């Protein structure tokens, strides 16, 4: 299997990266191209998972190893394919997803795209015990940050814009409401 690839990012189109590795250009499916857009025509490392189906071979790509590991766990869940798993990972932060699974939070998981209550319950049932390797413990501050990002994404901002805004304006003692208000002001500039 191909764990990671290092090459020049030649193009980004329709949720796919085109990575030139030693004069061979690979098509890599990614859920959110936003992270990679800053690296066009530069050398980058993409963590990958190769999926072989009856009719195609696909490479799925991730910006970091935690996203790859979570993807590998999610595709093991009964009736959850790689496209659904990718949608889940790109819709939220890894720590937010893992925390919801560990805490058996069906409601939070159900807010992710393509996940209803039954699928959320199945994910929790099948993955709860295997989430220990992620060692995710969210502080109250982390929870506020993630909730603020989720709120901004719900309002139509991209995940990358939302993360950038929240990290720029974050103060130690801000309430969730204050964080969201300040982030909205930051984003409306």
Swiss-Prot record:
Any single Gene Ontology cellular-component annotation: cytoplasm
Annotated segments matching region Flexible linker: 135-139
GO molecular function: ATP binding; four-way junction DNA binding; four-way junction helicase activity
Transmembrane segment boundaries: none
SUPFAM superfamilies, A to Z: DNA helicase RuvA subunit, C-terminal domain, Nucleic acid-binding proteins, RuvA domain 2-like
Matches recorded under Pfam families: HHH_5, RuvA_C, RuvA_N
Keywords: Cytoplasm, DNA damage, DNA recombination, DNA repair, DNA-binding
Cellular localization per UniProt: Cytoplasm
Entry-linked CDD domains: UBA_RuvA_C
Region (Domain III): 140-189
GO biological process: DNA recombination; DNA repair
Region described as Domain II: spans on this chain: 64-135
SMART domains in the record: HhH1
Domain I, as annotated region: 1-63
Subunit and partners: Homotetramer. Forms an RuvA(8)-RuvB(12)-Holliday junction (HJ) complex. HJ DNA is sandwiched between 2 RuvA tetramers; dsDNA enters through RuvA and exits via RuvB. An RuvB hexamer assembles on each DNA strand where it exits the tetramer. Each RuvB hexamer is contacted by two RuvA subunits (via domain III) on 2 adjacent RuvB subunits; this complex drives branch migration. In the full resolvosome a probable DNA-RuvA(4)-RuvB(12)-RuvC(2) complex forms which resolves the HJ.
Domain notes: Has three domains with a flexible linker between the domains II and III and assumes an 'L' shape. Domain III is highly mobile and contacts RuvB.
Listed HAMAP family: DNA_HJ_migration_RuvA
Function recorded in the entry: The RuvA-RuvB-RuvC complex processes Holliday junction (HJ) DNA during genetic recombination and DNA repair, while the RuvA-RuvB complex plays an important role in the rescue of blocked DNA replication forks via replication fork reversal (RFR). RuvA specifically binds to HJ cruciform DNA, conferring on it an open structure. The RuvB hexamer acts as an ATP-dependent pump, pulling dsDNA into and through the RuvAB complex. HJ branch migration allows RuvC to scan DNA until it finds its consensus sequence, where it cleaves and resolves the cruciform DNA.
Family: Belongs to the RuvA family.
Descriptive protein name: Holliday junction branch migration complex subunit RuvA
